[in-house]
A protein has these predicted regions:
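Beta1-alpha1 glycine-rich phosphate/pyrophosphate-binding loop at the start
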Residues: 1-83, 148-238, 344-345, 425-426
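C-terminal, flexible cofactor-proximal segment of oxidoreductases
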Residues: 4-25, 56, 60, 349-352, ...
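Rossmann-like dinucleotide-binding core of oxidoreductases
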Residues: 136-143, 148-178, 183-186, 270, ...
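Catalytic cores of eukaryotic secretory-pathway lumenal/extracellular enzymes that build
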Residues: 183-232, 245-261, 277-310, 355, ...
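A conserved short coil-to-beta-strand element within the FAD-binding core of flavoproteins
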Residues: 240-255, 309, 462-480
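Central helical "cap/lid" subdomain
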Residues: 287-300, 475-529
């Protein structure tokens, strides 16, 4: 019995239970799954006028039509069960394109069809898996070794792919468990701002019915990461409590020497044919240089290093910073503290999403494990809703006149919508509205989800301070206008060293060339964000210019990068080469295009200073590409762009 037949059997075992689940599930993915199974477009054509967008809250299917969709889905599944049929052929490219456009209210071009076929695993059970083109028994894989630095999403993805290919590897992780940033961040309210059914690997598990919320909290994400590592038996391939300090290339042996401090503080080394860094960008906290911070006598800690031994209940708490971490932590602790004083340098644009706090319905969870193609179409919708459906609106319109507040007509309309939300939430409080309104276009900085931030600001025990901080004394914070704010606890929600890629890791390539000398303090560049000339057999996940500043899922980026890296390693091994190294001209040409494209994006606006930029104002973290463009660039490894020795 195939996996498809097992799902059909599970779905139809109790037709009444199936009907109940359909009645309480997200209906458009159900409808798309029905079309996929039946090739009957009539209901989708009828429903199209009621679909205003990819988000479920932009869909208003009438009850009578919904009932017919549910009944038709039950009937088609029962027919499959009665005849014991296997999965139908994948719809044609034209049919898929039609389904996609009707399911999200248009905008999907034919270029997206191969991308979504891979992302939804319609072409193959695991669309991004890389397989050998030669008999692996002839390749002497046992003598190869890969070191992966980092045990978060990137490291786990690389390890799974290497394991599938039979290439020996070792993961070196500085923490004492898998999880990366999701292990380190545990502040109150910590969670994703990407829908969970997108914030997971496309290949595992299939489907994934486990999420309880549409935007899950930290513990659920961490459990997913660690259970994935367990499912692929990665614990035995990993050393924890390891701080990698140096990675040095030896030209004579064409191997990398990886030096690290172990859990006992002793220095060790390990040799590797290839190195993959998966250290992330948001994992090295920034401690602000505020006069007197070191003299403060109360608890003071970064949000990414939350001290759970400190009880904030009934205390006077200060949060310095108003980024994503503060946006989640502040509303979570505000009801229980004596007072909460928020020190804001610049206000953020905050978008309301009606699904943000909603649970995944029981019907949706039930169907994810039983209705064929339901999870695939749900993933498609979320990918379109969070990213590709609006990426084009983040490019500057050269004919747009008022670029101080917006960069094009769509951006201006979004600004008006966000301002309406601010005014409604702050109930006409003009002082707060002025303080909370950014002076730059939407998406100039990372767009945040409203976690009750504005409602928090309306609480009588919460104050928003927009003056700068002059100094911190033993028991208080002093603002630049001289006002004293006594506080019992200080939370530093002050971000990370996002522009200092790989810091503080020392990487030395050919002729002892230091990567830190090539990049300087914070001017990282890499081909595809993955690899750099003079550093053969060295690859990065989540490298320079790969942060998704507009939305989507970083896991999508990671999967694209890892698939590309696996192809590079495969090419090197199959050609019996020792090294693979990107040509300098290819690297340089790509980065010129990166800079040109970034200059057209909203986050390069003159009024914006964000963590994507380095100290000179160059964007080093954010990707200017749509997901489609990046997927096209990383889909196939081009040997002619590389030198092999």
């Amino acid at each position: 019995m195939t996996e498809f037949q097992k799902m059909v059997q599970a779905a139809t075992a109790d037709p009444e239970e199936l009907r109940r689940a359909l009645e309480h599930a997200e209906i458009v993915p159900v409808l798309l799954a029905y079309v996929h199974l039946s090739r009957d477009f009539s209901l989708l054509n009828e429903a199209a006028e009621f679909i205003d967008g990819a988000w479920s809250f932009k869909q208003r299917i009438p009850a009578e039509l919904r009932s017919r969709i549910c009944a038709s889905t039950v009937n088609v599944l029962l027919k499959y069960a009665e005849t014991d049929r296997d999965a139908p052929p994948t719809p044609s490219a034209d049919d898929l394109l039609n389904m996609m456009n009707l399911g999200v209210n248009g905008g999907v071009s034919e270029d997206y069809v191969p991308l979504f076929k891979q992302e939804m695993n319609l072409s193959a059970p695991d669309g991004r898996a890389v397989s050998w083109r030669r008999d692996p028994s002839d390749l002497n894989l046992a003598r190869r070794h890969v070191v992966i630095v980092g045990g978060g999403f990137g490291g786990i993805c690389a390890a799974i792919r290497l394991k599938n290919m039979g290439i020996p590897f070792t993961i070196l992780e500085k923490n004492y468990g898998f999880g990366g940033t999701w292990l380190e961040n545990s502040y109150p309210g910590c969670g994703v701002d990407t829908p969970n059914h997108l914030y997971c690997f496309a290949f595992h598990p299939k489907p994934n019915p486990a999420w309880t919320r549409q935007f899950s909290r930290r513990d659920e994400v961490l459990n997913y990461i660690q259970s994935t590592a367990k499912a692929f038996d990665l614990w035995n391939c990993t050393r924890f409590g390891i701080e990698v300090t140096d990675i040095q290339f030896d030209e004579a042996s064409a191997k990398w020497l990886v030096l690290f401090r172990n859990a006992d503080g002793c220095t060790e080394e390990i040799a590797a044919d290839f190195v993959i860094t998966a250290v992330g960008q948001l994992n090295r906290p920034v401690t602000p240089d505020i006069p007197g911070l070191d003299k403060y006598e109360g608890p003071a800690f970064h949000s990414a290093r939350w001290d759970h031994d400190v009880d904030t209940k009934g205390k006077n708490v200060a949060i310095i910073g108003t980024g994503a971490s503060a946006m989640q932590a502040g509303p979570s602790i505000a009801p229980d503290v004596q007072s909460l004083t928020v020190f804001q340098r610049t206000p953020q644009w905050i978008m309301n999403n009606p699904n943000y706090r909603k649970p995944v319905s029981e019907g949706t969870r039930w169907l994810l494990g039983r209705l064929p193609f339901f999870s695939e179409w749900l993933r498609f919708q979320l990918l379109w809703a969070t990213s590709e459906g609006f990426h084009h609106t983040l490019l500057r319109d050269p004919d747009w006149k008022d670029e101080q507040t917006a960069i094009n007509a769509t951006n201006a309309q979004l600004r008006d919508d966000l301002l309406t939300h601010i005014r409604e939430e702050l109930e006409g409080d003009e002082d707060l509205i002025a303080k909370a309104t950014p002076n730059y276009p939407p998406y100039g900085k990372r767009m945040l989800r409203d976690n009750g931030w504005y409602k928090m600001l309306m609480r009588p025990n919460v104050s928003l301070v927009t003056e700068g901080i002059a100094e911190i004394r033993e028991e208080a914070i002093v603002s630049t206008n001289g006002e004293l704010y006594p506080v019992d606890v200080i939370v530093l929600a002050t971000g990370f060293r996002a522009s200092q890629i790989l810091w503080p890791l020392n990487v030395e390539g050919r002729k002892n060339l230091r990567l830190s000398d090539v990049w300087g303090k914070d001017d990282a560049r890499a081909y595809l964000g993955i690899t750099v000339p003079e550093f053969p057999n060295f690859f990065m996940t989540y490298g320079p210019n790969t942060t998704l500043a507009h939305g989507g899922s970083v896991i999508f980026q990671i999967e694209c990068q890892v698939a590309y890296i696996m192809q590079a390693i495969r090419q090197t091994i199959e050609t019996e080469s020792r090294t693979v190294e990107v040509r300098a001209c290819v690297h340089d040409s790509f980065n010129k295009e990166v800079d040109r494209r970034c200059a057209q994006m909203v986050w390069n606006h003159s009024l914006v200073k964000n963590y994507y930029m380095n100290s000179k104002g160059r964007v080093v973290a954010a990707s200017p590409w749509s997901l489609l463009e990046y997927w096209q660039k990383t889909r196939a490894f081009a040997p002619e762009e590389y030198l092999f020795t």
